[in-house]
């Protein structure tokens, strides 16, 4: 973890968190993918993992400074602030764009995810049968998740708690969208409505589930990255590649739902061949790919500095 950051650095961290939050609002795009793109993924996992019995004991015994430093709190607070700002400010905008300009939005994210798959794969030091197999397995798992059918589920607070715990684990996995997991659990639009209408009980229970889920799962992921780095990165890159099925821009609606305002919106969709806005879509794909390329080069330059 970097020892010293200035105010400008923390401002950039907030912006990176906003990128993660914007991605997490979209079913099919992972905040974990954005964390990988902007170069904060492993620090994020390690920082979350550091929230444990030892650091919590420091907090409750008044050793605030030790607790703050131990969990890399300045970093975490910046990221969480960015995610929160993005979710509450962009939720309405992104859901509007997905309804009225879906091809253009998905095209941009398709370029982002495709480029991310390539650049994350470059982090694998040695390709062999183990990493290739891990890459394929990750891709198959992600593809299967994208074609699964959404379930009919209850809306009680216990289930909302479980949804928070499960979705947050997906959110920190590149290529596995926490929002799409909520779609499969039948609760994406329910949670989005809770955010837009500021339904405090539902949001608090969901956040509590997310807090438990992320602190538990981050330990597993941190261990895997430390002990089996190449295999873990291969699985994560496979997740990204497999998720491209979900972010393919051209779709036809198979099943719809009616939201709380009486508007009919798509729930289950199938991919089709490009049939409209082709050049605009290609342009946005190139833009998405180019942004990742630029961020990768920027990251390499700052690492060498």
Model-identified regions with their sequence ranges:
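Multi-pass membrane proteins that catalyze or facilitate reactions on polyprenyl-/lipid-phosphate substrates
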Residues: 2-24, 30-305
């Amino acid at each position: 973890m970097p020892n010293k950051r200035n105010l400008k650095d923390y401002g950039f961290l907030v912006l990176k968190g906003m990128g993660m939050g914007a991605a997490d609002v979209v079913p099919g795009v992972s905040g974990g993918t954005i964390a990988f793109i902007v170069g904060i993924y492993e620090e994020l996992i390690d920082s979350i993992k550091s929230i444990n019995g030892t650091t919590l004991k420091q907090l409750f015994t008044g050793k605030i400074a030790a607790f703050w430093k131990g969990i890399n709190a300045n970093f975490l607070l910046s990221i969480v602030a960015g995610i929160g700002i993005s979710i509450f400010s962009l939720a309405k905008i992104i859901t509007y764009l997905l309804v009225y300009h879906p091809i253009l939005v998905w095209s941009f994210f398709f370029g982002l995810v495709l480029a991310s798959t390539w650049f994350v794969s470059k982090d694998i030091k040695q390709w062999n049968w183990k990493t290739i197999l891990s890459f394929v397995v990750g891709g198959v798992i992600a593809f299967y998740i994208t074609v699964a059918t959404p379930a009919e589920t209850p809306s009680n607070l216990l289930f909302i708690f479980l949804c928070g715990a499960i979705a947050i684990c997906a959110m920190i996995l590149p290529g596995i969208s926490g929002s799409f997991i909520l779609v499969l659990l039948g609760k994406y639009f329910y949670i989005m409505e809770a955010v837009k209408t500021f339904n405090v009980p539902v949001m608090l229970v969901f956040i509590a589930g997310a807090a438990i889920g992320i602190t538990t799962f981050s330990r597993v992921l941190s261990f895997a990255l430390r002990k089996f780095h190449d295999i873990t990165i291969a699985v994560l890159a496979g997740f990204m590649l497999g998720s491209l099925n979900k972010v393919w821009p051209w779709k036809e609606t198979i099943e719809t739902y009616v939201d709380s305002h009486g508007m009919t919106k798509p729930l289950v969709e199938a991919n089709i061949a490009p049939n409209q806005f082709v050049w605009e879509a290609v342009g946005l794909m190139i833009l998405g790919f180019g942004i990742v390329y630029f961020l990768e080069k920027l990251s390499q330059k700052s690492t060498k500095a």
